[in-house]
Design a protein with these regions (language model features):
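Non-catalytic helical/linker scaffolds that mediate oligomerization, partner binding
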Residues: 1-471
Length: 471
């Protein structure tokens, strides 16, 4: 049984040694993530080339994800670089950019004074130190320190429950996205998205520069949660970024939010990624905790298309072992899924198109005939995406002549992309797709398969289903 849940591996110093990326692909990596909060364009380009070369050697499609730094709110400079903040003392966030000390420091978001009020909580350095706002004095924010802790230059500031007037993308984000377009990357994981207009702004930037990257907003603050339905409607997928989300909303709310986001993404057939601290202990240990195994397993049971490794592969001591463990967990969970129940549950929902209805029928047919695979030759990826929505037990083999389409649908649950030549007719399409599935080992002689494809020749735009045995 082939793994259906996609694994995203963050690239970094731990993946740089020769052979590591090859081992990640062999162990189950489907997508490579590049975190543009760190590193230079030159460093990322070297890693992009390394992934592409390894994918070529493996004969597999590997998608590339550009994760933006985002419009973060951060502290300014401390004169000494770092200070010790003491519980109960006053600490002022200043409009002025002069170097700070243990009594004050600047903040880069200059409108913050107009967006907070007395009683609001601000969190520094991912929640390490809490501040409560006492008063707004001109454009300065006077606070009381809630707990002692060290603090240093440029640490992040979070404002839980407050919608901030931050831009959708920073100047750095714009430069990074243009770099991604120029280097044919596939997805933008857009940090700190608060509203649908943020997504539209990024889409406009991509179109302006002739790009085709799909946009995956990261839901990591209360505004993103509150505006989720509208954000989902204009997005190509969603990432549940649990690390920052757990700072911005109460930690006990994160599992509830995660499940609801997955449910809504599944309902409309858009891919959803669950990220952050999934196998965190494997950064330094060769084996995960039992809680981490359960966390990964539950994300898969809930319906995640993809699960992501961050520091585990970027800077950890056991990057390959982490991917192997994630693959093992995914396979075990997928063996336990009640595919017939999933098909029945999703058949209740209103289907919006002929392709939607035919895709559901295809999955039902594949289940009832015990087909080994569903073959989806595709020009645009549309049929493949809709088939994936219904979570078939059979492997989805997508034969695509367009490299960009092959990489985009590769993020989808259960889809194995094959990049092939453009076909010349219906029979050539069927033959090419079947040969490709055989040569890649996704099917074998004697396997029963279901083929579904949108026809664009003389069939008037129809969708056809064919059941056949591989010979």
């Amino acid at each position: 049984m082939l793994k259906k849940t996609k694994i995203i591996c963050t690239q970094g110093p731990a993946t740089d040694p020769d052979g590591i990326v090859d081992a990640l692909i062999e162990s189950g990596m489907n997508c490579a993530r590049f975190n543009f909060s760190h590193g230079t364009h030159a460093e990322h380009l070297v890693r992009i080339s390394k992934v592409r070369e390894a994918a070529e050697r493996a004969g597999k499609v590997i998608s590339l994800i550009l994760d933006t730094k985002g419009p973060e709110m951060r502290l300014g400079e401390f004169a000494e670089g770092k200070v010790q903040l003491e519980k109960g003392k006053q600490f002022t966030l200043t409009y002025d950019d002069a170097p700070g000390d243990e009594t004050h420091v600047s903040v880069n978001h200059k409108q913050l004074y107009s967006e907070v009020k007395p009683g609001d909580t601000l969190l520094l350095s991912d929640g390490l130190v809490g501040l409560v706002v006492d008063e707004i004095r001109g454009k300065d924010i006077v606070t009381t320190i809630q707990n002692s802790g060290p603090m240093s230059t440029r640490k992040r500031v979070a404002a839980p429950g407050i919608e901030l007037s931050l831009p959708a993308i920073s100047e750095q984000d714009e430069r990074d996205i243009i770099f991604g377009i120029q280097n044919d990357m596939d997805f933008v994981a857009a940090s700190f998205i608060q509203r649908p207009s943020d997504v539209e702004e990024i889409r406009h930037l991509i179109a302006k520069h002739g790009g085709h990257m799909e946009i995956i907003p990261k839901i990591e603050n209360l505004a993103g949660v509150n505006n989720f339905d509208e954000i989902l409607a204009v997005s190509d997928g969603i990432m549940v970024a649990r690390g920052d989300l757990g700072v911005e909303v109460p930690a006990e709310d994160v599992p509830v939010i995660q499940k609801e986001i997955i449910r809504k993404c599944n309902a409309v057939g858009k891919p959803v990624i669950v990220a952050t601290q999934m196998l965190e202990s494997m950064t330094t240990n060769p084996r995960p905790t039992r809680a981490e195994v359960s966390d990964v397993g539950n994300a898969i049971f809930d319906g995640a298309d993809a699960i992501m490794l961050s520091g585990e592969t970027a800077s950890g001591d056991y990057p390959v072992e982490a991917v192997k463990m994630m693959s093992t967990i995914a396979l075990r969970m997928e063996e336990s899924l009640e595919y017939d129940s999933i098909i029945r549950a999703r058949s209740i929902r209103e289907r919006s198109s002929v392709t939607d209805a035919v895709s559901h029928a295809t999955v039902q047919l594949a289940y009832e005939t015990s087909a080994a695979a569903i073959l989806t030759p595709t020009q645009s990826g549309y049929t493949t995406r809709v088939v994936s929505k219904y979570r078939p037990k059979a492997t989805i083999v997508a034969y695509a002549p367009n490299p960009m389409v092959a990489r985009h649908i590769n993020l989808r649950w259960g889809v194995y992309s094959i990049l092939g030549r453009k076909w010349t007719g219906v029979e050539d399409m069927i033959e090419s797709c079947t040969r490709g599935a055989l040569s890649h080992g996704y099917v074998k002689q004697g396997d029963k398969v279901v083929m579904v494809a949108g026809m664009t020749y003389n069939e008037g735009g129809s969708v056809a289903i064919r059941v056949t045995t591989i010979h």
